[in-house]
């Protein structure tokens, strides 16, 4: 029993930061979930595991990964968060110009609205899924996106797309392989990423899984778009099957991430991606039931 208790405590303890500026209690620094207001609210950087770092805001996850061939950044947050992201990267002791590759999850302004700004500051190359390329090049939402009418109010600066990577494709960067998993649940171009992170003899597969929420504009009805529903369900199955020792999500609240990074909840938990996908599946079923009842 003592050994089990010690194991539970160690699994919840925050990793000691190994770089200046890294926080051991990002949850306290951010405070209670503020929703939309947190999307550009500065947060201190925090260690995730080994060479992976949280450099996002209080409401939007941005992940920085060290490799021997340079840095990789996944997502940027909205445009007004870009200066905070760059500041967090510098606080960890990195030069943003060390970023060589930019990856992304959904093609929405809250997660990649700052991509053009970060790209200009770093010169890094942007990799996208096929169905996200149009939105990133134009700065405008895909008309097939259930949130298109909402997203039209928040156009993004067009970004330079350097590489289009299909689902299952990967990038080998400095010995770390980043694999793209298309999961068009939240948006047509949604993508999740997995990579291996080793700390000493402990190696984990990190899954940065895109949102499982099927959100839409008020006048959009999923039960009138069977192809979109089928795509969303396929995306949920993809997330359920991800290799997933450690789950990250684009909105930290989607996986209690800030508490987990602060040692207030276990960083890892069994079947995390499967549980995350199941919650999204339940919400989609509830949405379809409400639409059916409103007919």
Predicted segments with their positions:
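Divalent metal-coordination and catalytic microenvironments
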Residues: 51, 65, 75, 85, ...
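N-terminal pre-domain segments of enzymes
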Residues: 16-44, 283-294
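Acidic/histidine-rich helix-loop elements
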Residues: 27-30, 34-43, 76-80, 138-152, ...
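Conserved beta-strand hairpin/beta-sheet module of binuclear metal-dependent hydrolase folds
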Residues: 38-92, 96, 192-214
